[in-house]
């Protein structure tokens, strides 16, 4: 009988090689010891190329070095054999007993299986979604939300101390456009007809907010609307200058009442956003207001620091940041000639604020259209004497919806978009969360609505959840306490399918760490699909409630462990694990 099963075989084997290097006086080489999973089972369960890394500094043949290092594994109780292959690969073969006992370790660990201390408590802030509160969240925001929430969960499982943050863009021009759009619809309800700018916000939600204001205040905010279009050239044209003119006039006409309209639409949209995300299973520790950076003087302070460092210059009355010195294609304005700070200026202040809060690393999750923004933000960090390497950017490509094989059109300003809420109502939260992370975040995602709604094995989320439900059904038929399976004798798990399933369970903790290290929660989704596939094959070819008690309990322990891993993985992705389907 071998000792209690090692939860992390790779760490165990890494320690063996690290000790071997120390004994040989080679610790100073500080080499990365990595174990890979061979593509062919005939090459073992783990393979290491350390001998080839040592060949040059030791001036020896890799195979000779590998032969020497292989002797260090003789004391491991988890290895059946060690082979040297090719130019000097060290291939390790786990004992059948080590694999068999792993299902018991999974059951003992429960919901903590797959968690590790890799992050060692490192403080990481993950900022994601951060959509302008100018309308309902749409399906593009949904992908960023699903990715960000899943990544934060994965990082936490890997031992990092994670803070989830939403940056509220409540100080920008887009909020003024929404306030203007709502006021114009409000005027219509008061019998004041006017040309509605084609580049204002067109959605029905704007009319809904106007109705709420009208219901509460009737005609209180009808202030000389006939003057709204005064001195606004081409007010009916689709030009930004015309829109700015209307906003300026609205502020003058409404006076202090403009703040009410502005704050009302902000609070309405922000409240809707919070509720929408909560229903999507996405929550935040901090909601950070952009306006607070202006109110506290943070934006002015950040610009002042850049000016002190000689990173700004004046041109045409505006202040420019020398971002081209940091790899940007051109310099960027931080303060316009009229004294107003740009969005870039508040973004600099926001990142300065982030690092002042003591995070070891900051992860920004942006839409892929912000790719060009990376160099200027990192440049500003460097100019402020902050380490730009501690700021990491994960880009998320837009999700394109397809219904009946046809692309669904999207335009936020024109009010032509599918909201995240509508998507959830159509396909369900589980399907949406899972489909959003099926691919790497920076890859385009075609979201097939018909597939997401189907109850077939072609639907990946259904396929994975059905595997979980099948295990629940087997255990329910058994009728005993699953807790007793923790002590089951698993030596009867000798079939090829069983050993393959056990190896798949062994791979789960490594998959979680890889997903955390590479910012790739899609690795969890891939893993779950593969695990479900192996389980379904095993289920279709195996009887579980057999008369022989040892075999029965061993198989039940195995599938119970599969259920636990499916549950744990789905939880990281924000997807439920139903007991019945």
Swiss-Prot record:
PROSITE patterns found in the cross-reference section: AA_TRNA_LIGASE_I
SUPFAM superfamilies on file: Anticodon-binding domain of a subclass of class I aminoacyl-tRNA synthetases, Arginyl-tRNA synthetase (ArgRS), N-terminal 'additional' domain, Nucleotidylyl transferase
CC per GO annotation: cytoplasm
Enzyme kind, highest EC tier: ligase
InterPro entries according to UniProt: aa-tRNA-synth_I_CS, Arg-tRNA-ligase, Arg-tRNA-synth_N, Arg-tRNA-synth_N_sf, ArgRS_core, DALR_anticod-bd, Rossmann-like_a/b/a_fold, tRNAsynth_Ia_anticodon-bd
GO molecular function: arginine-tRNA ligase activity; ATP binding
Catalytic activity, reaction form: tRNA(Arg) + L-arginine + ATP = L-arginyl-tRNA(Arg) + AMP + diphosphate
Record carries keyword ATP-binding: yes
Tree of life domain: Bacteria
Principal cellular location given in the protein's record: cytoplasm
Enzyme Commission number, as recorded: 6.1.1.19
Single biological process term from Gene Ontology: arginyl-tRNA aminoacylation
Compartments, as annotated in UniProt: Cytoplasm
Motif position, 'HIGH' region: 131-141
UniProtKB keywords: Aminoacyl-tRNA synthetase, ATP-binding, Cytoplasm, Ligase, Nucleotide-binding, Protein biosynthesis
Keyword set includes S-adenosyl-L-methionine: no
Oligomeric and partner information: Monomer.
Family: Belongs to the class-I aminoacyl-tRNA synthetase family.
Record protein name field: Arginine--tRNA ligase
Taxonomic classification: Bacteria, Pseudomonadati, Pseudomonadota, Betaproteobacteria, Nitrosomonadales
């Amino acid at each position: 009988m071998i000792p209690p099963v090692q939860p992390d075989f790779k760490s165990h084997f890494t320690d063996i090689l690290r000790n071997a290097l120390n004994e040989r006086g080679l610790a100073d080489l500080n080499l990365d010891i990595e174990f890979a999973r061979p593509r062919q089972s005939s090459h073992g369960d783990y393979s290491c190329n350390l001998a080839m890394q040592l060949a040059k500094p030791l001036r020896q043949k890799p195979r000779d070095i590998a032969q020497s290092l292989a002797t260090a594994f003789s004391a491991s109780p988890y290895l059946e054999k060690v082979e040297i292959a090719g130019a000097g690969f060290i291939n390790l073969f786990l004992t059948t007993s080590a694999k068999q006992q792993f299902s018991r370790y999974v059951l003992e660990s429960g919901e903590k299986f797959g968690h590790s201390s890799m992050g060692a408590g490192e403080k990481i802030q993950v900022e994601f979604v951060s959509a302008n509160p100018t309308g309902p969240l749409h399906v593009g925001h949904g992908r960023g939300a699903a990715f960000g929430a899943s990544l934060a969960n994965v990082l936490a499982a890997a031992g990092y101390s994670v803070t989830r943050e939403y940056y509220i863009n409540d100080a920008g021009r887009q909020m003024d456009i929404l306030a203007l759009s709502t006021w114009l619809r409000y005027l219509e309800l008061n019998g004041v007809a006017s040309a509605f700018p084609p580049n204002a916000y067109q959605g029905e939600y704007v009319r809904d907010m106007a109705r709420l204001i009208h219901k509460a205040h009737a005609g209180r905010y009808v202030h000389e609307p006939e003057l709204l279009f005064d001195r606004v050239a081409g007010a009916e044209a689709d030009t930004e200058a015309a829109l700015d003119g209307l906003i300026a006039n609205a502020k003058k006409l409404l006076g202090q009442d403009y703040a009410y309209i502005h704050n009302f639409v902000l609070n309405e949209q922000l409240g809707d956003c919070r509720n929408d995300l909560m229903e999507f299973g996405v929550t935040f520790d901090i909601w950070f207001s952009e306006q607070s950076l202006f109110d506290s003087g943070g934006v002015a302070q950040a610009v002042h620091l850049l000016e002190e460092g000689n990173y700004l210059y004046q041109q045409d009355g505006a202040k420019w940041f020398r971002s081209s010195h940091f790899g940007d294609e051109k310099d960027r304005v931080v303060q316009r000639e009229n004294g107003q700070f740009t969005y870039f200026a508040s973004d600099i202040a926001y990142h300065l604020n982030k690092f002042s809060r003591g995070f070891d690393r900051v992860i920004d999750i942006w839409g892929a259209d912000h790719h060009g923004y990376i160099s200027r933000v990192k440049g500003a960090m460097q100019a402020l004497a902050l380490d730009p390497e501690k700021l990491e950017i994960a880009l998320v490509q837009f999700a394109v919806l397809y219904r009946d094989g046809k692309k669904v059109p999207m335009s936020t300003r024109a009010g032509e978009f599918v909201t995240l809420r509508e998507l959830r109502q159509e396909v369900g939260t589980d399907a949406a969360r899972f489909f959003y992370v099926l691919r790497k975040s920076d890859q385009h995602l075609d979201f097939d609505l018909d597939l997401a709604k189907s109850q077939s094995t072609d639907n990946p989320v259904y396929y994975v959840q059905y595997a979980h439900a099948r295990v629940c059904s087997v255990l329910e038929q058994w009728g005993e306490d699953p807790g007793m399976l923790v002590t089951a004798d698993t030596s009867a798990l000798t079939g090829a399918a069983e050993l393959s399933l056990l190896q798949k369970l062994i791979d789960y903790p490594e998959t979680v760490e890889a997903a955390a290290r590479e910012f790739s929660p899609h690795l969890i989704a891939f893993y779950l699909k593969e695990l479900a596939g192996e389980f379904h094959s095993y289920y279709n070819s195996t009887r579980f409630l057999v008369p022989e008690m040892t075999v029965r309990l061993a198989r039940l322990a195995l599938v119970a462990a599969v259920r636990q891993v499916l549950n744990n993985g789905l939880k990281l992705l924000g997807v439920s694990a139903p007991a019945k389907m």
